[in-house]
C-alpha cells in the first residue's frame, strides 16, 4: 500500500547491479516486479512491465539499430528512453548480452517515495493515477531524453530488489499490433496501480 504523508516509505532491498540485467529479458521482467525504482529519490514499487526482444516484431530493435534505438544494442543495465506518439517519454531497461537488443518497458509503479513531487509534476492528487502508465510514471519521476543511456546502478537512477513475496500475473502486452500473442506482460496480481487490470 502506498504511504501517506503520515507514514514512512517501505524499506529498500539490496541495490540491483548491472549484472542483474544480463539475463533473459523475460526473467528480468518477472524479477523486476516488486522492485523499487527511484530517480533522484522519487519513485515506487514496479508493479507492471513488458518484455521486448529483437526477434519479435513488436520490439523497436526488430529492424536493426537506428539513432533512436541504438542503446538497446549496447550492454545491459542502461536506460533506454524514447518518446511515444510524439507526446510521452517511456523508460526501458536494456537486458541480455550486448547486441541482443532486448529491453523491459516499465509500465506502472506504486508510488512510495516523493509522492508530493509526483503530485506537483502530474498536477494530480489521486495516488493510484500518478504512475499508472508508462507516460504517467516518466512525468511523475521527471524522466526525459536526458536519462537515455544512463546506467541503472548510479545516480540519478537507483533500483532495489523486492523485499516481500508477491504473486506475479502474466498476460499479453498492451497497445501493440504485432506479436500480440506473446504473454510478455508481467505485474502484481490484484494491484490497484496497474495501467490496466490483468484478465482474471
UniProtKB/Swiss-Prot annotation:
Question: Do the record's keywords include Hydrolase?
Answer: yes
Record keywords: DNA damage, DNA repair, Hydrolase
Membrane-spanning residues where?
none
List GO BP terms, alphabetically: base-excision repair
The record, for Gene3D superfamilies, names: Methylpurine-DNA glycosylase (MPG) (3.10.300.10)
Which Pfam families is this protein grouped with?
A: Pur_DNA_glyco
- Asked if Oxidoreductase is a keyword of the record, the answer is no
E.C. designation(s): 3.2.2.-
**InterPro entries (UniProt xref):** Formyl_transferase-like_C_sf, MPG, MPG_sf
Fetch the CDD domains from UniProt.
AAG (cd00540)
* Listed SUPFAM superfamilies: FMT C-terminal domain-like
Which Gene Ontology terms cover its molecular function?
alkylbase DNA N-glycosylase activity; DNA binding
Q: Report the sequence similarity comment from the record.
A: Belongs to the DNA glycosylase MPG family.
What protein name is recorded for this chain?
Putative 3-methyladenine DNA glycosylase
Species: Bradyrhizobium diazoefficiens (strain JCM 10833 / BCRC 13528 / IAM 13628 / NBRC 14792 / USDA 110)
Amino acid at each position: 500500500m502506498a504511504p501517506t504523508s503520515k507514514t514512512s516509505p517501505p524499506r529498500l532491498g539490496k541495490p540491483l547491479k548491472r549484472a542483474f540485467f544480463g539475463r533473459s529479458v523475460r526473467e528480468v521482467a518477472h524479477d523486476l516486479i516488486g522492485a523499487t525504482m527511484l530517480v533522484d529519490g522519487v519513485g515506487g514499487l514496479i508493479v507492471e512491465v513488458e518484455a521486448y526482444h529483437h526477434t519479435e516484431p513488436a520490439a523497436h530493435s526488430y529492424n536493426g539499430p537506428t539513432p533512436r534505438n541504438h542503446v538497446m544494442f549496447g550492454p545491459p543495465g542502461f536506460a533506454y528512453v524514447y518518446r511515444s506518439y510524439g507526446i510521452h517519454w517511456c523508460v526501458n531497461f536494456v537486458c541480455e548480452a550486448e547486441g541482443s537488443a532486448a529491453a523491459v518497458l516499465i509500465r506502472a509503479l506504486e508510488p512510495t517515495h516523493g509522492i508530493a513531487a509526483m503530485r506537483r509534476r502530474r498536477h494530480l492528487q489521486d495516488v493510484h493515477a500518478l504512475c499508472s502508465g508508462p507516460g504517467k510514471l516518466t512525468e511523475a519521476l521527471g524522466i526525459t531524453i536526458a536519462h537515455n543511456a544512463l546506467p541503472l546502478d548510479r545516480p540519478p537512477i537507483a533500483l532495489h530488489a523486492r523485499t516481500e513475496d508477491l504473486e506475479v500475473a502474466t498476460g499479453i502486452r498492451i497497445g501493440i499490433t504485432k506479436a500480440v500473442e506473446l504473454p510478455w506482460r508481467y505485474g502484481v496480481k490484484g494491484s490497484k496501480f496497474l495501467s490496466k487490470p490483468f484478465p482474471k
